[in-house]
Amino acid sequence: MNNTEYYERLGVDKNASQDEIKKAYRKMSKKYHPDLNKEEGAEDKYKEVQEAYETLSDEQKRAAYDQYGEAGANGGFGGGGFGGASGFSGFGGASGGFGGFEDIFSSFFGGGGAQVNPNAPRQGDDLQYRINLKFEEAIFGVEKQVKYNREELCHTCGGSGAKAGTHPETCHKCGGRGQINVVRDTPLGRMQTQTTCDVCHGTGKEIKEKCTTCHGSGHEKVAHTVKVTVPAGVETGQKMRLQGQGDAGVNGGPYGDLYVVFQVEASDKFERDGAEIYYKMPMDFVQAALGDEVEVPTVHGNVKLKIPAGTQTGANFRLKGKGAPKLRGSGNGDQYVIINIVTPKNMNQAQKEALQAFAKASGIEVSGSGKKGFFDKFK
């Protein structure tokens, strides 16, 4: 399997740091951007660069790619990341892609591995929440109130799971160990194994009278609200960790974390690539031929731009510092203005005569057979 192709697309070594990968991505992205490079195949190259960076910029995906190639990066060899679910979801209990081996041994030996103290504190599950941002909100940052459901300690029993006035007792069957010994006949002979206690289900505690609110779980679902300060310059797919805002822990363990994933809406005016912003500017062919000073919209407000005479479609001009804020760094990126010359469709008589006079002065025959046409002059 080829697990170096993504590095080759960006032109970096397999041991490159994240800063080196990001720098190379910016360079290659500009090189093949469809608005800046009109060569055949440039758009495909641009997509390949995007695909490579999406994987190599994520440490989990990169590790999977380094080990298994493209199949690993796409999730073909076990879990990683957040999946594609919107809203929120739990993260606990993931076992990767090799659970089958464990299942085989469990069928013989009752679930091997090191024994875990059932009464040990355990951190609660992590949650995920997706925030939709407008284009400008992602550029300048914003505060959002996020409301979601999470598991908190039961307000009635305080997390014990027992009815008020009672308390959990040590399990009578396993003696608080959470495991019981079982003798089994296996293909290897009669063997004594350990398995999870069927009374306390591994907790080591037995609740005689369950709490009427949480029914013995010690947790209850509660609507929870948290303020999220979205930093300026975030992009789709980036995530933010809010410590302690996930589900409640077990046996006094800490709360899990909330991971906020950003989804940025597209702009009907601008395109964005990291801190760089692109704007396609329609321009009359007379302005392009004679040159002009025009107003250009940016996310920071309109600015004036001088267009030199003879400007062609596809020409681009850089407005330094008029891009998006750099999330990891200082200052802003740049805005690139890509010129798109518009040919008039409906002209009045005066306009037609003016163009015919121009054609005559240029020695161009615009009609008739076998003679140069107006646009042949530029071929």
Swiss-Prot record:
J domain residues: 5-69
Binding residues annotated for Zn(2+) 1, in chain numbering: C154, C157, C211, C214
Keywords linked to the UniProt accession: Chaperone, Cytoplasm, DNA replication, Metal-binding, Repeat, Stress response, Zinc, Zinc-finger
Record-linked Pfam families: DnaJ, DnaJ_C, DnaJ_CXXCXGXG
CDD domains reported in the protein's UniProt record: DnaJ (cd06257), DnaJ_C (cd10747)
GO biological processes: chaperone cofactor-dependent protein refolding; DNA replication; protein refolding; response to heat
Zn finger region (CR-type): 141-223
Subcellular location: Cytoplasm
GO cellular component: cytoplasm
Record's cofactor remark: Binds 2 Zn(2+) ions per monomer.
Cofactor(s) the record lists: Zn(2+)
Superkingdom classification of source: Bacteria
Entries under InterPro entries matching the protein: DnaJ, DnaJ_C, DnaJ_domain, DnaJ_domain_CS, HSP40/DnaJ_pept-bd, HSP_DnaJ_Cys-rich_dom, HSP_DnaJ_Cys-rich_dom_sf, J_dom_sf
Repeat positions for CXXCXGXG motif: 154-161, 171-178, 197-204, 211-218
GO terms assigned for molecular function: ATP binding; heat shock protein binding; unfolded protein binding; zinc ion binding
Chain sites annotated for binding Zn(2+) 2: C171, C174, C197, C200
Gene3D superfamilies from the UniProt entry: DnaJ domain (1.10.287.110), Heat shock protein DnaJ, cysteine-rich domain (2.10.230.10), Urease metallochaperone UreE, N-terminal domain (2.60.260.20)
Subunit structure, interactors included: Homodimer.
Alphabetical list of HAMAP family matching this protein: DnaJ
Entry's family note: Belongs to the DnaJ family.
Record function comment: Participates actively in the response to hyperosmotic and heat shock by preventing the aggregation of stress-denatured proteins and by disaggregating proteins, also in an autonomous, DnaK-independent fashion. Unfolded proteins bind initially to DnaJ; upon interaction with the DnaJ-bound protein, DnaK hydrolyzes its bound ATP, resulting in the formation of a stable complex. GrpE releases ADP from DnaK; ATP binding to DnaK triggers the release of the substrate protein, thus completing the reaction cycle.
Domain notes: The J domain is necessary and sufficient to stimulate DnaK ATPase activity. Zinc center 1 plays an important role in the autonomous, DnaK-independent chaperone activity of DnaJ. Zinc center 2 is essential for interaction with DnaK and for DnaJ activity.
Protein name, per record: Chaperone protein DnaJ
Encoding gene, per UniProt annotation: dnaJ
